[in-house]
């Protein structure tokens, strides 16, 4: 589908719903930049003007399948060796149960729609509505984590009220590149962008709560308005 043009959701492409499983192990920000070149509305698809759709399965689906298969293989191997230790059997059976539970709970397809024509978002699981609300409740956020040695890593997360946080890119040490990509995604989807700090002039707020409705996140001074060009995604 050409960039920037409306089109129907590629329902024939099963892999489209698994795109968030592959975030890139090395240079994750470059991996995301390549995806944005192929689809400037990533991870969404522009179904029609001002309407963006994202269909996906949780990555706990493949993790549960992997745990289930490994546990079943180990149970079979232990049976052949006639292992009688109760602790071993309890651990393996527990792995089978947890793996099966993860698979079953992750099988329902998720669907998130950003409808700027109506000014609302809609989130459903297997066709059943979970929540819907105004667009100021949906955002792209830069998140921060650190390891035991004090090294900082940044993640880009798509989140919102009663939405499952979706990691778009993770474990990058390059703040400027991650900020640029986060702002780019938020601008293309026309949603809010928030820095990893709760109060920051780097927030970009495009949608405010209606008067008297309260706020989910504290108001912050606006600053560093994104460049209107932002055509290059070389990072």
From Swiss-Prot:
This is Cation channel sperm-associated auxiliary subunit TMEM249. One of its GO terms (cellular component) is sperm principal piece. Residues 1-67, 106-235 are cytoplasmic. Residues 226-235 have a biased composition (Polar residues). It comes from the Eukaryota. Keywords: Cell membrane, Cell projection, Cilium, Flagellum, Membrane, Transmembrane, Transmembrane helix. InterPro entries: TMEM249 (IPR027861). The keyword Lipid metabolism does not apply. The gene is TMEM249. Auxiliary component of the CatSper complex, a complex involved in sperm cell hyperactivation.
